[in-house]
Amino acid sequence: MENVTDRTSNPFGMRPACESPCSERSEAAFGYGDANADFHVIGDYPGIHGGRETGVPFTERPAGEAIQRALFETGFASEPYGDAPELENCFLSYLHMCCPADGEPTAESYANMERFFDAELRAIAAHVLLPVGERAMEYVVDQYTARLGRIELDMAKLHASEVRGSGFLVVPIREPTDWEEGDGQRLIDSLLAIRGSDYRRTADLSRFLGTDELYFVR
């Protein structure tokens, strides 16, 4: 199923009740990119991965710059960095798109934002999930691989590897500010190899429907 929209930022009209706007320019760092993407990059929240001013995930901060450069080198982005990057076959979003007034989101706040993230992930229906950092990786492993507790969440070891999930291919990305020499190239090489392969898998998204109806995508 193809999403028909010309909106790059917040293409599905998510409206979480953020306690405060990220800035005068942006209410939140909404999901951004190609609404029909096969590759979905998943970050934590704007305070870590950027986007408070731009309203775009993975902008403004060094972590976002590193991710965007990797996307450029692998053909997903048209330039090495942009506050409003032009992306193809790639979507960017956060577990927590709002900017809490007190800084870091609480566990309750993350839980409140979960339904918005899950709805967006279902709508994108990407085949490859790229969680950035340990929190995003833990969430993806728990929700989309059913392997939590069976995978050691050592991001240095997992970085740029392939983890098979419930219809998804998961490619963990170490926190970019922790990258050591070669980590950026490892990610680039991994993404290039995946793009050249048959990465599309049948994903069972039935659990998102809340009914007995079966919903599979490829």
Each language-model region and where it sits:
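A polyanion-binding, active-site-adjacent surface
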Residues: 2-218
